[in-house]
Amino acid sequence: DMKFILNESVLARDNFYIIKPKIDKYLMFALLNNYYTYYQLEKNGKTYGAGLLKLQRYDIENLMFPNLDEFNEEEVEQLILASRNLSKYGDESEIQTISKIISNHSAVEYSSIVESLDRIKELRLKGEK
């Protein structure tokens, strides 16, 4: 499964791209670890044999994130808390929590992004992307 990892003051993809955020590291961690971001990476990454998804630096640089100015203070705090829990405990249900909060600021509903992500991931793993 795709995910970003938090290591002290930097965020790194599991293939070791280092991201130095200009915002709170846990908030950035939340923006990276949600179904909306995963969908973009599935769409833009290159597929290789056995369903391998190769991500390049420009795939990360071209990610579209929601405008954080549209989030209220409570939502930002919830994103940070869920992100901390994901980082500390590895509880992947926190990805759902993060995605649901972000869905409040997206034209794409939560259920639609989950369905679209599942479908594109399934096609990639079958070698049909």
Spans of model-derived segments:
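Non-catalytic DNA-recognition/assembly elements of restriction-modification systems
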Residues: 67-129
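Polybasic, glycine- and aromatic-enriched phosphate-binding surface used to engage nucleic acids
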Residues: 1-81
